[in-house]
Amino acid sequence: MSLKPNIVTDSILEGFWEKGLVLFGDRVQEEYALKTPIFIDLRHKLYEDLDMLSTLGHALYEKLHSLTECDDCLDVPQQVIGIPDTATPLALATALASQQTSWPVNYGQMRKRPASYPGGRSGGSSYMGTVDPKRQVTLIDDVMASGRTKRWAIRELQKEGLTVTRILVVVDRKQYDYIEQDKLPCPIYSLYTITELIEYYVSSRKIDDVVANQILAHVNTRRFT
């Protein structure tokens, strides 16, 4: 992998590096016992840094705004919902970022497990928020890998009368060869692909070609279908 000349500094990727939000090699095994050469850890350390979380929320908001603008949907009410638990604060940060603009976005929240109240309309719901069929729902998550949690979230929201219009993630690992429409019936967008992230860290001399090639080889050989 060759260096890119005159690389433009990316404040988010620099922040990921400085805060240790991107784990490589043995660090992944130590933290999560996973056998992967790279892990995007938008959890503990991100939650401790509210400035970084706010920056990421603004970036997700700007991406969502550009997507709806391209689809000529700026006049359509929008809502973001994060896949629990990791993306719950990401979605909330996105909605909060929008409140400072002329294009506010609504917020909804999911539970990992349905509520266990005795009964009533919301007693067994996995969703907390307004159900408005006029809104376009964007599902927020940290990483796209197999798509399993996305399919689960879409099914749960459908039970509540919500249809997901699009999925927006921070990093897309691009480890899926195909996704059948009945499994994931909406487009996927991201702030970064795994290749873009790796190229940036190589070009800024944070990792070398050996590490980069190991990561990309792993991603390209471990596919989800």
Residue ranges and their predicted role:
Residues M1-I140, R148-T225:
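PRPP-associated nucleotide enzymes
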Residues A145:
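Short active-site segment of divalent metal-dependent hydrolases/proteases
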